[in-house]
Amino acid sequence: MKKQDISVKTVVAIGIGAAVFVILGRFVVIPTGFPNTNIETSYAFLALISAIFGPFAGLMTGLVGHAIKDFTTYGSAWWSWVICSGIIGCLYGWIGLKLNLSSGRFSRKSMIYFNIGQIIANIICWALIAPTLDILIYNEPANKVYTQGVISAVLNIISVGIIGTILLKAYASSQIKKGSLRKK
């Protein structure tokens, strides 16, 4: 079995991705009125980075980006949700492996596959794992954190479903389609 190294391109993608995640997470959110629960544009961007660079880049971008966002916003990280940002980034990357965006194609079938995958991933991460970790790590009240989790899952599904799909389509459209160049 050959050891796979992490490329410089992936490391740079993680760094830039985490920085953009922080900026979007701090300054491009829409409050919902429910405590600590916002419409987050950062997860749509995380889906793009993860789909392009893979599960490891998604994992690290989510972990590092969310941790820095929390430290710069609140002074400390809320680790249960930081962990889930890493998990969701990894899952977006895993979904993205089948999309093959670099081919220049993001068909209706690919959009449906991506959105079914992200819906399942968001429900698992935000409605199940994050609240459970909140209870185990921080001894938070179950009714509060599961309500936050379900609201976050729904909002992230909508955000990633709309903004993420647009970003993936735009990225795929910017790629040169295989066989589209012809020699005269």
From Swiss-Prot:
The source's domain of life comes to: Bacteria
InterPro entries recorded: ECF_substrate-spec-like, UPF0397
One Pfam family name is ECF-ribofla_trS
Q: Can you list the GO cellular component terms from the UniProt entry?
A: plasma membrane
Keyword Cell membrane (UniProt): yes
Q: Which residues form the signal peptide?
A: none
Q: Does the keyword Zinc-finger apply?
A: no
Q: Give disulfide pairs as residue numbers.
A: none
Q: Per the UniProt record, which residue ranges are transmembrane?
A: 11-31, 44-64, 77-97, 111-131, 148-168
Principal localization? membrane
- Subcellular location as annotated: Cell membrane
Q: Which UniProt keywords apply?
A: Cell membrane, Membrane, Transmembrane, Transmembrane helix
Mode of membrane association: Multi-pass membrane protein
- Give the family, as the similarity comment puts it: Belongs to the UPF0397 family.
Protein name as it appears in the record: UPF0397 protein SAB2561c
Give the organism, scientific name: Staphylococcus aureus (strain bovine RF122 / ET3-1)
